[in-house]
From Swiss-Prot:
Assembly notes: Homodimer.
GO cellular component, one term: cytosol
Origin species: Methylobacterium sp. (strain 4-46)
Residues carrying N6-(pyridoxal phosphate)lysine: K241
Pathway named in the protein's UniProt entry: One-carbon metabolism; tetrahydrofolate interconversion; Amino-acid biosynthesis; glycine biosynthesis; glycine from L-serine: step 1/1
Name of protein: Serine hydroxymethyltransferase
GO molecular function terms listed in the Swiss-Prot or TrEMBL record: glycine hydroxymethyltransferase activity; pyridoxal phosphate binding
EC number of the protein: 2.1.2.1
Role: Catalyzes the reversible interconversion of serine and glycine with tetrahydrofolate (THF) serving as the one-carbon carrier. This reaction serves as the major source of one-carbon groups required for the biosynthesis of purines, thymidylate, methionine, and other important biomolecules. Also exhibits THF-independent aldolase activity toward beta-hydroxyamino acids, producing glycine and aldehydes, via a retro-aldol mechanism.
InterPro entries for this protein: PyrdxlP-dep_Trfase, PyrdxlP-dep_Trfase_major, PyrdxlP-dep_Trfase_small, Ser_HO-MeTrfase, Ser_HO-MeTrfase-like, Ser_HO-MeTrfase_PLP_BS, SHMT-like_dom
Pfam families in the record: SHMT (PF00464)
Reaction it catalyzes: (6R)-5,10-methylene-5,6,7,8-tetrahydrofolate + glycine + H2O = (6S)-5,6,7,8-tetrahydrofolate + L-serine
PANTHER family on file: SERINE HYDROXYMETHYLTRANSFERASE (PTHR11680), SERINE HYDROXYMETHYLTRANSFERASE 1 (PTHR11680:SF35)
Length: 433
């Protein structure tokens, strides 16, 4: 065989061998994770289950393509087809949220937030955000985060008596500190936000009003949650969670001048080449979210959350704010003298996945907490309705009551029985079968 026709050692299998053939160890971990998702009830509020179409787009050959820049203005050749993917994502995002500009390149919600900070502030500038301990997010000024290191965060909180946003405090802090930016949004607040009032306060001090709707974007898209537009100057979101797309971020605005600053902040300010396979997955998910079926899904997410909250309250637990308007709730363990850490572990043993979470004015350490956070997006995606979520609420109460009786090791018999019922439920609503 001549040198010109010689084959490399990889050529026979490199493009055809499966993951199981090439890397059995990793393949086994993937299959185990698939089994976990299939047979456990996922109640982590920030997680969801994507369609097979999203998985296919994200696992496509678009992962091979470098595409620094923006559609039609790339720094590499050969981008004509990935431009189609990104333009589809942009146009669908704009339709979905009724805005004029969308940047779909951020690799995460955190990077989307960083881009907004870069576009609207200088290091050392002051901004207002919800305290992490009251349901805010790390990127809204927590001391370990870059937002707390490079800028001067001032935190507003919730009222002790009803755990709702203290808008009088927001107005007072804005007047006192004259922030450049005011943020609405968080990771543990179960009620609607008064976007109009926030904008009024922002206008009174000349601040940019920034909404981080990472948790409830899918509910906005589905028409069951108030939209931050037209009140917000700029909006960020993740593309997973309630929006049910691949893990990633996005920035939206109606302000052309601000959009240009955001584009520059994303690239070249924070990122180089965007992840085109993920952007393709975003395009697919946004297309799905434009369908009538998604509106039905979003409505069901909220109805399921209310049913779950009501059932848990009936079981003797407190829900922060007394209920929920969206997809999530914080369950206060203190009426049963439990910690969030112990509750998370007990529920995990029973096949129910959630996360420990602080509650407002929590006396426990962040690594222990007095609460757990529950959400309905993932189990709703697999087909659970109100009846199933009432049952899930009853199962949660059974496990936690057993924990209260037996101590930190939990009630093994109760947990085993609940695990069997969890498997019966998940078998009725299979995923990726």
């Amino acid at each position: 065989m001549s040198a010109g026709t010689a084959k490399t050692p990889l050529s026979n299998s490199f493009f055809s061998a499966s993951l199981a053939d090439v890397d059995p160890e990793l393949s086994r971990a993937v299959q185990q994770e698939l089994g976990r998702q299939q047979h456990e009830i996922e109640l982590i509020a920030s997680e969801n289950i994507v369609s097979r179409a999203v998985l296919e787009a994200q696992g496509s050959v678009l992962t091979n393509k470098y595409a620094e820049g923006y559609p039609g203005r790339r720094y590499y050749g050969g981008c004509e087809f990935v431009d189609i993917a990104e333009n589809l994502a942009i146009e669908r995002a704009k339709r979905l949220f009724g805005c004029d500009f969308a940047n779909v390149q951020p690799n995460s919600g955190s990077q989307a937030n960083q881009a907004v900070f870069m576009a609207t502030m200088q290091p050392g500038d002051t901004f207002l955000g919800l305290d992490l301990a009251a349901g805010g997010h790390l990127t809204h000024g927590a001391p370990p985060n870059v937002s707390g290191k490079w800028f001067k965060p001032v935190s507003y909180t919730v009222r002790r008596e009803d755990q709702r946003i203290d808008m009088e405090q927001v107005a007072k802090l804005a007047e006192e500190h004259k922030p450049k930016v005011i943020i609405a949004g968080g990771s543990g607040y179960p009620r609607h936000w008064d976007f109009a009032k926030f904008r009024e306060i922002a206008d009174s001090v000349g601040a940019v009003f920034f909404v981080d709707m990472a948790h409830f974007a899918g509910l906005v898209a589905g028409g069951v949650h108030p939209s931050p537009f037209p009140h917000a100057h700029v909006v960020t979101t993740t593309t997973h969670k309630t929006l049910r797309g691949p893990r990633g971020g996005m920035v939206l605005t109606n302000d052309e001048a601000l959009a240009k600053k955001i584009n520059s902040a994303v690239f070249p300010g924070l990122q180089g080449g965007p992840l085109m396979h993920v952007i393709a997955g975003k395009a697919v998910a946004f297309g799905e979210a434009l369908s009538p079926d998604f509106k039905i899904y979003a409505k069901q997410v909220v109805e399921n959350a209310k049913a779950l909250a009501d059932t848990i309250i009936s079981g003797g637990f407190d829900i922060t704010t007394g209920g929920t308007d969206n997809h999530l709730m914080l369950v206060d363990m203190r009426p049963k003298n439990l910690t969030g850490k112990a509750a998370e572990a007990a529920l995990s043993r029973a096949g129910i996945t959630c996360n420990k979470n602080g509650v407002p004015f929590d006396p426990q350490k962040p690594t222990v907490t007095s609460g757990i956070r529950l959400g309905t997006p993932a189990a709703t995606s697999r087909g659970f309705g109100v009846a199933e979520f009432k049952k899930v609420g009853e199962l949660i109460v059974t496990v936690l009551d057993g924990l209260a009786r037996a101590g930190e090791a939990g009630d093994g018999a109760a947990e085993k029985k609940v695990l069997e019922e969890v498997h019966a439920l998940t078998d009725r609503f299979p995923i990726y079968a």
